[in-house]
Every structure is written in structure tokens, then in C-alpha cells.
Regions:
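Extracytoplasmic "Venus flytrap"/periplasmic binding protein-like
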Residues: 48, 52-116, 148, 152-153, ...
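Extracytoplasmic/periplasmic substrate-recognition and gating elements
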Residues: 51-52, 57, 129, 152-153, ...
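Glycine-centered hinge/linker elements that transmit conformational signals in sensory
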Residues: 170, 209-239
Length: 424
């Protein structure tokens, strides 16, 4: 919350966005993106925009450590016009600090897939009227699988938890390792955790906890059970193997499946460029209709309140949201378009296509977790604990640590609740 407080102090004098006219008479619009890996795509988009616009000059920068740079600039009241970040806790903090412009009147907002607009609303600590981000590109996480291995053995993609465990048993009996986990790097523990949680918990679980309507001990109990079940089908001592180890092992055919997001595919293909990889939604439930795809907003654009040229910023956003520009970005970076329309879906995500089309998607639970809480390490510690009360200890700690690291936020949420009740 320290970041929020610091940012909140500087919203009273928004003076940045020095968008005075350039020497050539054009209005300068600056976009800062947190994705250095997309620099080539943005350079191409920037060039195409500037070649087709006489009155606006667009500059898109994608620096390393962009979030640190942005936070420093915000404290100095040196604001870009637009920022391009993910739909996660940073977005929540910046929104809570009242840094973003309401862009509800932007035409492009009407073309965003509803699921992604809903995700952004759930990232609001306190409900706000309006729309404060334009979701652009999303990712998806479930279970990667070796399509050739599946075809050769007649294995079918599972659609329920029972089918999944039965498949794991069948693969194990054939002499092949069903899963690779690679839990040495603690962050990898969050991949199956998130993918299971979206199907087993309400998407607003964290907010419900803040309001006092539930506890993590109650909400996360089935998630804790099922993530532990994965250990029965994985490599011995997965805590000895890193993310790179797991990618390499899966690429070499040492397991049939890998519980990681599609973002791991480039790393896997660097080892085995010809590998035929698929990805399916984690079937967390025994009723397929209850399953939900774990998808989150990887990139979205927000206009800063300090922007002096909202009309020019809107023109930039409308250009960025054209089908052609979105496809330029996706061709370079992959992923899922947040805009409704006929956009190509990578072959590796084809098994998830119906979920995407039907808006059966929910955000990563960890997008709501404060980084100081180190939930990834908590999950790893829980899985290492073989005691009878391991789950109880883990979930009680989850609740107590949540209160510790979100004390101010919980008070803010509950004060808001009381105000709403008093106003009735």
C-alpha cells in the first residue's frame, strides 16, 4: 500500500504530460509499455502510425524495468500520456491512486470482449463507475501436452477432473511420466494453482475475503487438495528442477504434459523447434460446464488523467485497436485478442478456442495478490509439508498473511461497504 499512498499524494497536482506542440506543429503522444519483448512490434506500429498521421507524432517506448521507471516518474509527476501494462495488482494500485482517465466514451471500448472488461472491474479495489483501461492482448494457461505423443497412444484431451486423473494413471501405467512441474523456481507453483483456482473458486474471491464474506481457508480448500494430487503424477522431487529444466524435459519427451502457461512455448521450442504442442483448459471440475479457462490481460492501455490532449490520445487508441494493428502485434507476440472479432488463434491454443469464443474465462487469482505476500513460496512450502495438518496450516497462514499485507485495503473496502449500507 506504500506505493498507493505515494501515488495518491501526487494526484492532487497532475502536471506531467508535457504535450505541447512539437517544432513541426504536431501533437506529441507518449506511450510507455512494460513489455520490452514487444519492442519490435511497437516500433513497427509507431512507424506506421506516424507515416499516416499529419497532426500527431507517436512515441512508444518499452524500457527494461518499466514498472520501476513508471512509479518513479509518477512520484515526480512526470506522466506519459498513455501507459501499456498488464491487468494485475499494479493496475489496481494505479487506479486506486486515481491516476487514470475514464475512457468509457471511447468507441473502441464497445468492441472489447466482455470477459476482459469484467476482469478489469474485478481489479478495482473499490467499485468505480467508468472504464479505465482498453484490454488489448491476453494470454491463457492450462496444461501443455505433447500432441504427437497423445496421437500415437490414443490419449484424449480430458474435459473433467476424473478424466484427467484417469488419463494420468493410464499414462503412468504405460511407463511415461504424465506431468512435469519444475517447482524449484517458486513462481512456477502459481501456474497450476491459478489454472485450478479459476474453475474451483469465484473470480472475485479476494474481494469477498476483503469484505469479510468468506475466508481463503474455505474458498481455497479444493484448490489446495487438487494441486497436491498433481504430485502423484509428476517427477520425483519437483523442487529440484527449475523452470528451464522442466521446459527442457518436456521438449525432450520426458513427460506427456506440463502444467504451465502458453508463455513457456518459446522456451520449449528453443530446445525442440519441431515439437507439436497443444494446450487445454485445466479440467478442475467433474462437470465440464463448470470449467473455466485461466486467461488474463497481458497488455492494456490506460490514458493518464494528466494527459493534456485526450482527443489525440483517443485517436492513438483507436488506431491501436484497429484489426490490422492488433494482428500486427499478435503476429509478433502471439496470444489472444481482447477485441471481439475474427482474429487468428495460435495453433497451440486451438483446444481452448470454444472457451475463448464463449467468454468462459477468468483472471489469474495471483493478479490480486500483493507481491510482498510471496504466495508462490507459500504454495511450495505447503507442498513440501507432508504433515497431516499441512493444508490447515497453509490456508490459515494464507488468511493471516492476507490480513497483514492488506490491512489498509481491507479497511478501505469495509468502510466503502458501510457507506453503501448507510446510504440505503
Amino acid at each position: 500500500m506504500a506505493v498507493v499512498l505515494a501515488l495518491g499524494m501526487c494526484t492532487t497536482g497532475l502536471t506531467g504530460c508535457g504535450n505541447e506542440k512539437r517544432a513541426d506543429g504536431k501533437t506529441e503522444i507518449e506511450v510507455v509499455s512494460y513489455k520490452p519483448e514487444a519492442v519490435k512490434a511497437f516500433e513497427k506500429i509507431e512507424k506506421q502510425f506516424n507515416e499516416t498521421h499529419d497532426d500527431i507524432h507517436l512515441t512508444i517506448s518499452s524500457p527494461n524495468e518499466a514498472m520501476t521507471i513508471l512509479k518513479t516518474r509518477f512520484i515526480r509527476e512526470d506522466y506519459p500520456d498513455i501507459i501499456a501494462i498488464g491487468g494485475d495488482i499494479n493496475y489496481s494500485n494505479f487506479l486506486d491512486a486515481d491516476l487514470f482517465e475514464d475512457i468509457s466514451d471511447l468507441d473502441a471500448v464497445d468492441t472489447v470482449k466482455k470477459a476482459y472488461l469484467d476482469m478489469d472491474k474485478e481489479l478495482e479495489f473499490i467499485p468505480k463507475d467508468g472504464t479505465y483501461a482498453l484490454p488489448y492482448a491476453a494470454n491463457a494457461a492450462g496444461v501443455l501436452y505433447n500432441k504427437d505423443m497423445f496421437a500415437e497412444n490414443g490419449w484424449k484431451v480430458p474435459t473433467t477432473w476424473s478424466e484427467f486423473t484417469a488419463l494420468c494413471n493410464e499414462i503412468k501405467e504405460s511407463g511415461t511420466l504424465p506431468l512435469y512441474l519444475g517447482f524449484k523456481d517458486t513462481w512456477t507453483c502459481l501456474a497450476p494453482w491459478n489454472a485450478l483456482a479459476v474453475g474451483l473458486c469465484d473470480s472475485d474471491t479476494c474481494n469477498q475475503v476483503n469484505m469479510g464474506n468468506t475466508t481463503f481457508e474455505e474458498a481455497y480448500s479444493p484448490v489446495a487438495d487438487k494441486i497436491r494430487t498433481l504430485l502423484d503424477y509428476a517427477e520425483d522431487n519437483p523442487y529440484a528442477y527449475s523452470y528451464n529444466d522442466a521446459c527442457t524435459a518436456f521438449a525432450r519427451g520426458e513427460s506427456a504434459m506440463y502444467t504451465i502457461g502458453s508463455y513457456a512455448i518459446p522456451q520449449i521450442k528453443s530446445v525442440n523447434p519441431d515439437m507439436n504442442i497443444g494446450s487445454f483448459t485445466f479440467p478442475a471440475n467433474d462437470n465440464e460446464a463448470d470449467n473455466v479457462l485461466n486467461s488474463g490481460i497481458d497488455l492494456q492501455f490506460s490514458v493518464m488523467k494528466a494527459c493534456k490532449n485526450k482527443e489525440a490520445a483517443y485517436e492513438v487508441l483507436e488506431y491501436l485497436y484497429s484489426d490490422e494493428t492488433i494482428q500486427t502485434y499478435l503476429d509478433d507476440q502471439g496470444g489472444i485478442a481482447c477485441k471481439d472479432g475474427d482474429f487468428a488463434i495460435p495453433d497451440t491454443l486451438k483446444d481452448m478456442q470454444e472457451y475463448i469464443k464463449d467468454n468462459r474465462m477468468s483472471d489469474y487469482q495471483d493478479h490480486h495478490y500483493p507481491s510482498e505476500m510471496s504466495v508462490d513460496a507459500m504454495i511450495q512450502t505447503y507442498l513440501l509439508d507432508t504433515g497431516d495438518n499441512a493444508k490447515e496450516k497453509f490456508l490459515k497462514k494464507f488468511d493471516s498473511d492476507w490480513k497483514r499485507y492488506n490491512r489498509d485495503l481491507i479497511r478501505e473496502v469495509q468502510d466503502y461497504q458501510k457507506e453503501q449500507e448507510d446510504a440505503k
